């Protein structure tokens, strides 16, 4: 477990609450509210740790695919802001890649499942659109990460994996 003693008490408490929400796989909760509940002077590490927790799968391995208020979408949002401020930290890029990878794969899988049901064609198309948009974001993020860290084997492997799963027409 991470040592958060150097964070403020308010930051520690909120991170403990986040950990419980993730552990319990609460997919009714609007995780955007955590940003509002954060201390006014929250540290960059606090925000990274929150995004890291939100992009970690709960014990039941369930993906929260909600694009508004969902765990993974909020993690991507937080990490996007952090990357604007600190683009030279590879862990930020990696965590964003992880969250986007989960979202893109989850929506692609949902689209394929819905496509098997004739009465769900519209929903399948919507999910496929989301999967494509998320995979494009994933490729763009990997491209930017590899421009900064061209020799990083993890980013290279993730790019190759994304290429294999989402098609070479979008790959970096």
Model-derived features: positions:
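Eukaryote-skewed repeat-based solenoidal scaffolds used as protein-protein interaction platforms
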Residues: 82, 125-128, 140-147, 151-157
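Short intrinsically disordered terminal tails
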Residues: 1-2, 170-172
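Amphipathic alpha-helical repeat scaffolds of TPR domains
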Residues: 4-19, 39-63, 88-128, 153-165
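Residue-level detector of the short coil/turn that links helix A to helix B
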Residues: 25, 70, 104-106, 167
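Helix-turn-helix repeat elements of alpha-solenoid scaffolds
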Residues: 18-32, 64-78, 130-139
């Amino acid at each position: 477990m991470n040592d958060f003693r150097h964070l403020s008490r308010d930051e520690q408490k909120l991170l403990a609450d986040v950990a419980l929400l993730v552990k319990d796989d609460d997919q009714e909760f609007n995780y955007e509210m955590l940003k509002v509940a954060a201390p006014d002077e929250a540290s960059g590490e606090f925000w990274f740790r929150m995004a890291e927790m939100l992009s970690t799968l709960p014990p039941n391995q369930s993906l929260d695919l909600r694009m508004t208020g969902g765990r993974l979408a909020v993690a991507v949002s937080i990490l996007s802001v952090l990357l604007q401020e600190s683009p030279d930290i590879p862990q930020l890029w990696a965590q964003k890649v992880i969250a986007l990878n989960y979202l893109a794969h989850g929506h692609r899988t949902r689209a394929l499942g819905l496509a098997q049901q004739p009465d769900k064609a519209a929903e399948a198309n919507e999910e496929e659109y989301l999967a494509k948009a998320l995979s494009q974001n994933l490729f763009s993020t990997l491209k930017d990460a590899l421009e900064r860290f061209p020799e990083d084997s993890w980013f290279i492997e993730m790019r190759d994996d994304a290429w294999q799963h989402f098609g070479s027409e979008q790959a970096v």
